[in-house]
Amino acid sequence: LPICPSGSVGCQVSLENLFDRAVKLSHYIHSLSSEMFNEFDERYAQGRGFLTKAINGCHTSSLTTPEDKEQAQQIHHEDLLNLVLGVLRSWNDPLLHLVSEVQSIKEAPDTILKAVEIEEQDKRLLEGMEKIVGQVHPGEIENELYSPWSGLPSLQQVDEDSRLFAFYNLLHCLRRDSHKIDNYLKLLKCRLIHDNDC
């Protein structure tokens, strides 16, 4: 759904409405990324011992994110908003390359479709979050916080095991980060829209 009808002048969607959309979208992205990870895990990762290698290998690990709800509640909403933006921005490149490189994997039609959908929806969520930040802190240019990704060569390795592990790790991280964003947005909505009464 477009935020405003095309050609509408001075259209302003309420903050509550923007948060509703952002929370729905982030929930959708998280459920898609979980499905994609689970399908990939079942089809390609069985018996390869990927999980034991995948711990703490996410490119967004350099962004300090709260580990649980209690920690997240200690963070000022402005910092939490910027953190969500930073994590979303950090996924722009990897998602773009995931969409093109996943097509090299044999018999992965479902994964390809989900990757394309996630990449599109992630862009929408980032746009929505920029609108939210613009309303919460008008006129303030948020810092360009993000974590660069250098994993493209690993998605293009000739060795199939290494290449599949690189995909596995990326999908594992996407599921992890989309879950964090989903939780942070619910927390922010509760705090900024419902005055913590939820």
UniProtKB/Swiss-Prot annotation:
Source domain of life: Eukaryota
Cysteines joined through disulfide linkages: 4-11, 58-173, 190-198
One MF annotation (Gene Ontology) recorded for this entry: hormone activity
CDD domains listed in its UniProt record: prolactin_like
Keywords: Disulfide bond, Hormone, Secreted
One GO location term (cellular component): extracellular space
InterPro entries hit by this protein: 4_helix_cytokine-like_core, Somatotropin/Prolactin, Somatotropin_CS
Tissue: Pituitary gland.
Keyword Cytoplasm: no
Localisation per UniProt entry: Secreted
Any one GO biological process: response to nutrient levels
Family, as annotated: Belongs to the somatotropin/prolactin family.
Protein name listed in UniProt: Prolactin
Provenance organism: Chelonia mydas (Green sea-turtle)
